[in-house]
């Protein structure tokens, strides 16, 4: 079965599908729905909403942050981007779409942000499934931690 997964910057035509996203009960603990974070991301310079598409249908979402102020609490690398708010709508869980999207991410970032040499993210230490997804997608745990809303978060790094 072919998985035609691609990444695209948010476009207004994605909105109806993004507004209908639902999360699994487990995901509700650790991430936000696109409709909860999209309007804020669109209103702030250096935030880039990205949609995960399956055959041009939105199935996932995340935000890339380039703001030095936002990045400061995660990394001292001025050439890093922060990935946040990754979500996959519940009906598409378990199909490998999130992993495929994370495998596409380095090329996407390199193409649109040629100055970037690292992608960083924070994952809650209790979110084992997400941690495994990121590690299988090339992210590394270099031992850096921070405290988030639900406790300890691991700062993971993907060097480009």
Curated annotation (Swiss-Prot):
GO terms for molecular function: acyltransferase activity, transferring groups other than amino-acyl groups. InterPro entries: Acyl_CoA_acyltransferase (IPR016181), GNAT_dom (IPR000182). Its EC number is 2.3.1.-. The keyword Transferase applies. It is an enzyme of class 2 (transferase). SUPFAM superfamilies: Acyl-CoA N-acyltransferases (Nat). It comes from the Bacteria. This is Uncharacterized N-acetyltransferase YbbJ. It comes from Bacillus subtilis (strain 168).
């Amino acid at each position: 079965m072919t998985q035609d997964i691609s990444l695209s910057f948010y476009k207004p035509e994605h909105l109806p599908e993004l507004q209908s996203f639902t999360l699994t009960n487990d995901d509700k603990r650790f991430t936000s729905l696109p409709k909860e974070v999209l309007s804020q991301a669109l209103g702030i310079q250096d935030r880039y909403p990205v949609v995960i598409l399956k055959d041009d249908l939105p199935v996932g979402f995340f935000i890339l942050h380039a703001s030095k102020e936002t990045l400061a609490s995660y990394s001292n690398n001025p050439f890093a981007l922060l990935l946040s708010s990754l979500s996959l709508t519940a009906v598409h869980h378990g199909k490998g779409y999130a992993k495929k999207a994370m495998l596409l991410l380095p090329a996407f970032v390199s193409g649109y942000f040629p100055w970037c040499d690292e992608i960083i993210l924070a994952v809650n230490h209790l979110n084992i499934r997400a941690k495994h997804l990121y590690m299988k997608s090339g992210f590394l745990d270099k031992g850096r931690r921070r405290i988030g809303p639900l406790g300890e978060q691991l700062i993971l790094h993907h060097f480009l």
